[in-house]
Amino acid sequence: MKTTPWIKLCKGAVLALTVSFGLTYCQSTKSTFTLEQKGDSLTIVHIVHPTHYILLPIEEEADESQVRLDTGNATDTDMDIRLAQTKVDYFVPFALPADAKTVTLRIQKKPKDALCWEEIKLSDTFDTANTDKFRPVYHHTPLYGWMNDANGLVYKDGEYHLYYQYNPYGSKWGNMHWGHSVSKDLMHWEHLAPAIARDTLGHIFSGSSIVDQENVAGYGAGSILAYYTSASDKNGQIQCLAYSKDNGRTFTKYEKNPVLRPSDGLKDFRDPKVFWYAPESKWVMIVSADKEMRFYDSHNLKDWNYLSSFGEGYGVQPCQFECPDMVELPVDGDINHKKWALIVNVNPGCYFGGSATQYFIGDFDGTKFICDNLPNVTKWLDWGKDHYATVCFSNTGDRVVAVPWMSNWQYCNIVPTRQFRSANALPRELGLYTQDNDIYLSAAPVAETKNLRKESKDVPSFTVDKDYHIESLLTDNEGAYELSLNIIAGKAEIMGFSLFNDKGEKVDIYLNLPEKKLVMDRTKSGIVDFGKNSSPHEICLLYTSDAAD
């Protein structure tokens, strides 16, 4: 194989993570706690002069126990926590009320001989320094705990708010809260306290946020309204509202929640997306409803009326449509020719296994979405294996910025990390373009990504005969590179490159020109036995023969 490539490498920058709570933990000398064990079914923890936290030891393979802060109120909520039975994988902080003289925790379903009773600690702080060698360098991750879908993305007063599905009590799915991070440039994130906590209505599932500029809901002009799904066996999946008067730091739940229930009692009814429809001066909500999307409208942001549905029989029909979004964009930059893109996240059953993001292009008249394509046409927003739950920021003007979850439900709970699980893909700007008389949705990393570049190095052109070995480039690389390659195929049918280390681990990325495929083979990249699909990932390409030169 002979190729003539030109390579430019730009060193990535380590993101600065500002932590808004403690950095270390230590055993308190002022506070005490006692255990009142009532068999294996109930243990009551009595704490005198409580610290900020009680640190709970976690064993990921242990059964869940129910932990409740007992204040005597009807709103007291059980959290499902995998307390250590025979070993401690890590600790998580359980916040205790400020200024309380005594605190009571009720812990159910944990045997008296469990290791956790010996390992529980009281502390005023909690160590969030990174301990995981597999944490991404420049992607947003939670400081600790589990994260999946991005939620409530909204821009206000110079800040991008990234809320997300979050379990603060372990690095596996559960106890859904809305975690919260903010950024001024979409690259460097400040971690804040969780914004919306699980309550007696259920888990806080995915949703969206808007800025109520005109005080339509009555909570003050400029307040942030969050719409989310409360999910529980008792109440099913219902849509709820919370509002913030302090720039999204804290939220108050609407006293008349829920604002919307499924009229037909549908089990899978979640992930509300709310957006402004200017031609009729109204708000529109999309809710995923089994294998379709349902549309509603409102003029007061509290009472919602059914409009229509879309999706039955369209595109890939998996177990469930999830995390909808819909944006209007100019086609090929022409502001006089606009189309709507309906984003639908689907799981499982996707072309490349597990979960992914498809979309539909069409028209929306304020009541119905009409797709341009036939039902059997499927369009994927991204062909990567780790791309799901893509949703867009609101209140960004003409700019449409989306953030995906960088994982896959095939293996997300068992990736080889402990302190945290999951990351967000880079924010990307969306657009519409035409190809072969059809319209497609494009997604490119936001321009702010270039600000991560530091030192760069150009490699002079060279000819490859079978292979060409570059020993080392940018050795002080802080764990990340950007590679830009210009490859002339010549007579080669397969061309690409390998990234490898001295442990024998490698990733192969190459073009198979006869089959028109881009292949990423990460089956030898290190720990790979946790996934259900460890075969090379192949992407079918659309290009002419001239484009391959």
What residue ranges belong to the model's regions?
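Glycine-aromatic-enriched beta-strand/loop faces of beta-sandwich-type recognition domains
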Residues: 254-259, 503-542
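Bacterial N-terminal signal peptides
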Residues: 13-22
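Bacterial N-terminal signal peptides that target proteins for export
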Residues: 2-13
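Solvent-exposed, conformationally flexible loop/turn segments
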Residues: 51, 462-468, 478
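Beta-rich carbohydrate-recognition and catalytic domains
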Residues: 30-271, 276-321, 328-383, 405-462, ...
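Secretory/extracellular carbohydrate-interaction modules
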Residues: 468-522
